[in-house]
């Protein structure tokens, strides 16, 4: 791990360099030899006697030692050529940055601006712009080819075991193929069952796909607030989150310098960036929801589209007629965006402008291929409120809005709860699929109990694994600081690792091809006491190694056939290996290589023959038995 500083900037050093015993490799799709799709190869020890293991990689160029990282310049804008090659777009001057874009921050509090500006692109009328429009027209884009190669992890070996893997899981109606082709990706997008969030102005993006027939993805939330954090910290947290496996990142900043913070993040992010535009719109009217207007919100949408935001959370399902349904709740309306719109609706006694102007919102987002993440502003904030009428009324409206957005050519995913006990989780998935036409589901957890402040990454990880198994396409992480404070980089890592576990467990349960390869590789390393391979095959090699080294720090302990839990005499795996070694060294050559069960059967047969040889009596002379045993030894 290297910490690279950036000259002439107040921005922090960001974490670069590969993870332990890993290297960046690139797969080249057969149908697009000009593309280089990143993967991480875990390098196994010589004792492993098996190939290195390629795994999905979200870390971008930050883990490639051959790339020079300069946060001031941003990442390479590789995708701009793909967009221009397709045509149907124009470059234009774009709107000016206004003081209110950064919360009217004074010069003494203003963050350093990102100076490497590029003119924004937008789609032309009458041309295909979005991935959905291309997919419906039967056109396979480079983004589709790219994500297909990524999903396959560069491992055609999975074809050999895909049928067995699929048979071992319960997919609950998902249609995960043995091998992901670009055509399959195109078809899933055309059906609305998957999205590739990829604003045409986010040229630094490494495309990824969200859908229940693909690997389960996770999102990490970052962002400053009015009381804490800075641009420096948020850029650092973004790089840190993707290092550990965040597939997308949402910038939920609500304090000063919102525009500037977002610009630094976008220009340095290889993963899709999402936002909640109402947060910035609220800052522009000094935090007063009643003062919000459609014109102000529209201007904010265009501002963020031009910057390159890949998906917007828009709480258009919070309608005036639903607000009274939350009156009897234990925790009322807990969504920030939902509460803002509820207050606006009640103050003006009007339908939400997000709902009444939804067609126009679609037209704006389509020009930049910004995906919808239709927000659940009425999600339950406690298990007591789970699955109530307010929650499901909003979900039904989101289903209606999904069809409108699809008709306009926009990509859509649906946000979900929240706080839901385990026995009420599946109905959420089933109802979402039914109401929203199988659009991808994206949930916050859900948290399965409310009794564990400080441990809500665990309470939510349980629900996340379950709903991921049932078909949820992306899981929004929860950190230990949930309900308590703004997460720092340690909390971000804990949240990401927790949700990588949940997502992987869901893929295993669905029978996703090749999901188990990493588990099996680690299990073999564990049984063979290849400690270093165990660490490196895990999701967090650093923590695994540090835990082991707390009690067995010497290098010699990395090859020891025991750990500090059981010690050398009580290790079950060591005992099992001893049994196998015994089977391999029996005098009878026929027993060499015999399995444990075979050894047992052979031993039983020997004792049966001995019983008959000594007369077949139940009770025998002790001295004769002793003499017989000596003969066998």
From Swiss-Prot:
It comes from the Bacteria. The keyword Nucleotide-binding does not apply. The keyword Iron applies. One of its GO terms (cellular component) is cytosol. Pathway: Cofactor biosynthesis; thiamine diphosphate biosynthesis. Homodimer. This is Phosphomethylpyrimidine synthase. The lineage of its organism: Bacteria, Pseudomonadati, Pseudomonadota, Alphaproteobacteria, Hyphomicrobiales. The gene is thiC.
């Amino acid at each position: 791990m290297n910490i690279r500083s950036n000259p002439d900037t107040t921005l922090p050093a960001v974490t670069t360099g590969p993870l332990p015993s890993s290297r960046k490799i690139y797969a080249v799709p057969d149908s697009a030899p000009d593309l280089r799709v990143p993967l991480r190869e875990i390098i196994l020890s010589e004792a492993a006697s098996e190939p290195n293991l390629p795994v999905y990689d979200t870390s971008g160029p930050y883990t490639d030692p051959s790339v020079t990282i300069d946060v001031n310049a941003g990442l390479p804008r590789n995708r701009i050529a793909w967009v221009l090659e397709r045509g149907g777009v124009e470059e234009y001057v774009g709107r000016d940055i206004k003081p209110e874009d950064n919360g009217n921050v004074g010069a003494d509090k203003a963050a350093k601006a990102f100076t490497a500006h590029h003119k924004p692109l937008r789609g032309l009328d009458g041309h295909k712009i979005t991935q959905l429009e291309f997919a419906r027209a039967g056109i396979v884009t480079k983004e589709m080819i790219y994500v297909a190669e990524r999903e396959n992890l560069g491992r055609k070996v999975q074809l050999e075991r895909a049928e067995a893997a699929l048979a071992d899981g319960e997919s609950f109606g998902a249609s995960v193929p043995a091998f992901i082709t670009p055509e399959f990706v195109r078809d899933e997008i055309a059906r609305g069952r998957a999205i590739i969030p990829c604003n045409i102005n986010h040229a630094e993006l490494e495309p990824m796909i969200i859908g229940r027939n693909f690997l389960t993805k996770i999102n990490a939330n970052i962002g400053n607030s009015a009381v804490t954090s800075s641009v420096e910290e948020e850029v650092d947290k973004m790089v840190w989150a993707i290092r550990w496996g965040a597939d997308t990142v949402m910038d939920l900043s609500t304090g000063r310098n919102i525009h500037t913070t977002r610009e630094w993040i976008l220009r340095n992010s290889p993963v899709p960036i999402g936002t909640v535009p109402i947060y910035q719109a609220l800052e522009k009217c000094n935090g007063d929801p009643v003062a919000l207007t459609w014109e102000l919100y529209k201007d904010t949408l265009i501002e963020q589209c031009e910057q390159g935001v890949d998906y917007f959370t828009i709480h258009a399902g919070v309608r005036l007629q639903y607000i009274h349904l939350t009156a009897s709740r234990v925790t009322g309306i807990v969504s920030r965006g939902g509460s803002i719109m509820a207050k606006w609706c009640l103050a003006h006694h009007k339908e939400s402008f997000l709902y009444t102007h939804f067609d126009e919102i679609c037209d704006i987002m389509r020009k930049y291929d910004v995906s919808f993440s239709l927000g659940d502003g009425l999600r339950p904030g406690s298990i007591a409120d789970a699955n109530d009428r307010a929650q499901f009324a909003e979900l039904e409206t989101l289903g209606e809005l999904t069809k409108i957005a699809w008709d306009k050519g926009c990509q859509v995913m649906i946000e979900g709860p929240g706080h839901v006990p385990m026995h009420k989780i599946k109905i959420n998935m089933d109802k979402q699929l039914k109401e929203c036409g199988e659009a991808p589901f994206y949930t916050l957890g859900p948290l399965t109990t409310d009794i564990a402040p400080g441990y809500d990454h665990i309470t939510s990880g349980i629900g996340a694994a379950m709903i991921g198994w049932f078909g949820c396409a992306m899981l929004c992480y929860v950190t230990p600081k949930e309900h308590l404070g703004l997460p720092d980089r340690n909390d971000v890592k804990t949240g990401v690792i927790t949700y990588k576990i949940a997502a992987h467990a869901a893929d295993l349960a669905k029978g996703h091809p090749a999901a188990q390869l990493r588990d099996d590789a680690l299990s073999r390393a564990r049984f063979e006491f290849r400690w270093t391979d165990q660490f490196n095959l895990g999701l967090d090699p650093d923590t695994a190694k540090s835990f082991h080294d707390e009690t067995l720090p010497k290098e010699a302990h990395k090859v020891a056939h025991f750990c500090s839990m059981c010690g050398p005499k009580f290790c079950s795996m060591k005992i099992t290996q001893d049994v196998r070694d015994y089977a391999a060294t029996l005098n009878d050559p026929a027993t060499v290589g015999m399995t444990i069960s075979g050894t047992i059967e052979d031993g039983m047969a020997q004792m049966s023959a001995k019983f008959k040889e000594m007369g077949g009596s139940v009770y025998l002379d002790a001295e004769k038995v002793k003499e017989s045993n000596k003969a066998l030894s």
